[in-house]
């Protein structure tokens, strides 16, 4: 729904919509965009475009990010696992920063049992980090 709407914008070459972690809702929609060469659309303009063109309110993205190039599969489709990792890193780092912790996501790994897991590096205690990240549906662990 989000991708189809954005692809109607003449500045958008590719769009990849995913659910980004949210401590209250579980996940919220967000979208990563690759513009056509020479396009000048801004993230704010694309977010407004989505508000006008994505009819379902729950599907309207809460975050739009323009990337120089979206990750793609061998057949040219947007590779969403990399976008999910990027969103987890962005959301978790923002939450940790807002809480005043020095902890940051080092990487996000794909665990066969738990799915995507954020690996966090920090001098902060596990309890301090859990107080911030414990409300998110995606797990975290201390990085190596």
Model-flagged regions — what are they?
Residues 56-66, 101-102, 134-144:
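Conserved short beta-strand edge segments in small beta-sheet-based binding/regulatory domains
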Residues 1-59, 68-69, 76, 81-124, ...:
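AMP-binding/adenylate-forming catalytic core of the ANL superfamily
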Residues 126-136:
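Extended Gly/Ser/Thr-rich low-complexity repeat segments
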């Amino acid at each position: 729904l989000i991708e189809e709407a954005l692809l109607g914008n003449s500045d958008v070459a590719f769009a990849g919509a995913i659910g980004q972690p949210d401590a209250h809702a579980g996940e919220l929609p967000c979208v990563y965009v690759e513009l056509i060469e020479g396009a000048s659309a801004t993230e704010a303009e694309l977010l407004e475009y989505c508000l006008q063109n994505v009819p379902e309110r729950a599907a309207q993205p809460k975050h739009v990010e323009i990337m120089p190039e979206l990750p793609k599969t061998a057949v040219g489709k947007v590779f969403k696992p990399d976008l999910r990792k990027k969103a987890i890193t962005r959301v978790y780092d923002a939450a940790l920063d807002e809480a005043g912790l020095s902890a940051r996501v080092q990487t996000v790994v794909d665990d066969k049992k738990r799915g995507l897991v954020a690996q966090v590096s920090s001098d902060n205690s596990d309890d301090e980090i859990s107080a911030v990240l414990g409300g998110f549906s995606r797990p975290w662990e201390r990085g190596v």
